[in-house]
Swiss-Prot record:
Residues 38-73, 77-108 form the EF-hand domain. Ca(2+) 1 binds at residues 51, 53, 55, 57, 59, 62. Coiled coil: none annotated. It comes from Merluccius productus (North Pacific hake). This is Parvalbumin beta 2.
Length: 108
């Protein structure tokens, strides 16, 4: 799903680092997976991969399954992780993360 954007080895390392419940940290994850160093264009491409229903927003249910977009065998985020992730990214308070909000979150 992220071929041409992210390296498989970086994805594996990032997923391994947050394999235990309640250890997910979006800043650490985006840095480890290599996304925070990418161009605005690549970050936008990643957003559209994560936006599974193609609504133009990443909603709470998509955030919960965020890690599984990177690898099917990855765990779901806990409710606490999901809510913290949404709160960090949803700067306008509409309950979802838009493409511009996502870009800010990745670079945070």
């Amino acid at each position: 799903a992220f071929s041409g954007i992210l390296a498989e080895a970086d994805i594996a390392a990032a997923l391994k680092a947050c394999a235990a419940a309640d250890t997910f940290n979006y800043k650490a994850f985006f840095a480890k997976v290599g996304l925070s160093a990418k161009s605005a264009d690549d970050i936008k491409k990643a957003f559209f991969v994560i936006d599974q229903d193609k609504s133009g927003f990443i909603e709470e249910d998509e955030l919960k399954l965020f890690l599984q977009v990177f690898s099917a065998g990855a765990r779901a985020l806990t409710d606490a992780e999901t809510k913290a992730f949404l709160k960090a990214g949803d700067s306008d308070g509409d309950g979802a993360i838009g493409v511009d909000e996502f870009a800010v979150l990745v670079k945070a």
